[in-house]
Amino acid sequence: MAVFTPPSGNSNSTDHTHTQDDHDKDDNDIKKFYIRPSLGLKLWGPLVPAPDNLPGLYTLITIQSAVGFFALWRLRRLYKLPPPRRIATGTHSDLSFGELPSEMIVNGKTKIKKDIADFPTLNRFSTTHGDIVLAPPPIIPRQSRFVSVRKLLWGLFGSLLLSQSLLELTRLNFLKYDPWCDEMKSVRDKKFFNNIVKYYHEGIDPTKIKVKDAMNGTPLSTNIPEVKQSVALARAQVEAQNPIIKWFGPLEYKPMSFNEYLNRMEFHLDMFEFFQNKRNIRENSIELINSISHNPQSSSTGLEGLSESKKLHLQNVEKRLHFLASSGDSISAPVKRSSTTLSRGVILPHDTKGPQDIDLDTIRSLYDPWMTLALETSLSIKFIPTTMPSHTKTPTSTDQPLPGPTPKALTNEKTH
């Protein structure tokens, strides 16, 4: 028989375990390093610098291009290497490289003549002379497989490096908009200001940092807000000038994917084309107006057509007004009020009979809508400082509330 005893504080322990696991997961995410994006420097792996680090990018491009040219130079040396041939020396023959003498080639490449006395295996002191006809050398000399594989590897390696370097140079020099570069600049700025806020809230350790007045050299208190701001700014600048941060950017930065990069580039190109077409339309309209103003005779026919249509329109308007005026006499007119009140609270004089009797300047000065809105609106804004949440410490019932304004202090009132 067994007795089960539940552990004390089970709920608190599980909550603490979950919070600790979440905190460890956040730390692991922060410590994870992402390879910086690039188009032609992917062979360098994690050594690729940040997209906005132009000196680092050009340094890697130079090294990569130099290695590519060296590979092509080695390929050229292999192609210039002459084919092997055997030279008889004494009682054995050795495999050596060299070109046949020009006097051995007769009638182009049809045959080769060699004097018998030049062969060392025969009698050197013989007075007999004759010619031996040899086969002409092949147009494409035979080579070993090792030499062919070396040529293939050097050619592919050099071409790959140079093409990748050219692709990266195109991205840096010919693209007017680079999403990766803009993203890295914004990430650096955010990191810089976040470090200022973090160091300001951390405060100053008097045992490590001492602040003195620049004028007289007297030590200053580290609890002054201005001193804390200056020290936080200096610490953030020192961290931003770190060689690793300058090369890679913020270490926790996760770059955008290549698909998102292409989407932003496509959107930028579409917007550029839209504004380009809009500017072309505006320029064409300006040219058309200038041509009409400078050449009135060429556009006289068009202006005459416009004037005729305008005259017809005015005649139609006059006929309609005359019809309304004649029909208004037969209809009983409504009783007019002594004063007219509009929906916006504008009171017109009693002698106002039509829109032509309204003095717009006077009405505007008396009933300015923006001034009315300013007088009817009253705003009261108060700023409350924010606090950093803590992942390790959980609030208890014994904790005292922090001094400061309550949420009711933030008010936004509107009075009429």
UniProtKB/Swiss-Prot annotation:
Keywords, alphabetical: Membrane, Mitochondrion, Mitochondrion inner membrane, Transmembrane, Transmembrane helix
Subcellular location field: Mitochondrion inner membrane
Biased segments, Basic and acidic residues type: 15-28
Composition bias, Polar residues: 390-400
InterPro entries cross-referenced by the UniProt entry: i-AAA_Mgr1
CC per GO annotation: mitochondrial inner membrane
Residues on Mitochondrial intermembrane side: 1-56, 170-416
Residue intervals annotated with topology Mitochondrial matrix: 74-151
Job description of the protein: Component of the mitochondrial inner membrane i-AAA protease complex required for mitochondrial inner membrane protein turnover. Required for growth of cells lacking the mitochondrial genome.
Annotated family: Belongs to the MGR1 family.
Protein name: Mitochondrial inner membrane i-AAA protease complex subunit MGR1
Origin species: Saccharomyces cerevisiae (strain YJM789) (Baker's yeast)
The encoding gene: MGR1
